[in-house]
Amino acid sequence: MPDEINQPRYWDSIYKEPDEPRWVLGQAAPPLTHWLKSAKRQLGRVAVLGCGYGHDALAFAEHGFDAVGYDFAELAITRGQERVVPLHRGGRLKLVRADFFELPATESGRFDYVYEYTSFVAVAPERRQEYAQMCHAILKPGGMLVGCFYNHGRDGGPPFDARREDVLRVFSPLFEIKKLEVSEHSIERRKGHELWAEFVKK
């Protein structure tokens, strides 16, 4: 399985199934919506990793951020461009088919924010340190990683469990941990299992 999930065809095959993938909410993730509305945020450029159809990227754009959503699955990007991008009229939303592990080669230090939601748990566990390094590399000095880590407590994956101690072990060498706590705003099936994160690049 770990080798298979490193290939875009694996993720495209899931999008081709009759039912939508379970990670497609049809709206922005409620913890993100709360964060965007709860206080005035400094605007900037945000990378939305594993963006799917782009609902979270759309939420950022609608709040004035310049949002670039990246996804490995071509079908996810195609559907997002058809269904979600037309909902935004401000010119601040872009969806790109890409392997986010390759972003440091072209996007080093170009983002004020990185947004994480379901990507960390989709990555093979042996690549988690590489994932954290990628997030660090594409952020500007003092840039912030925000989002949720899915601590579901089950064996196997994807999604692979994101235990709090594992998240801290991977990210704390590269980021100052401002917040990592259970979100009070998760959808029903994830209540109590999503850790809201706010990390600042060291």
Predicted regions and their residues:
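Conserved acidic residues
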Residues: 112
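A conserved beta-strand element that flanks and buttresses the S-adenosyl-L-methionine
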Residues: 115
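Class I (Rossmann-like) S-adenosyl-L-methionine-dependent methyltransferase catalytic domain
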Residues: 2-48, 53-107, 123-202
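Short catalytic micro-motifs in class I SAM-dependent methyltransferases
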Residues: 118, 122
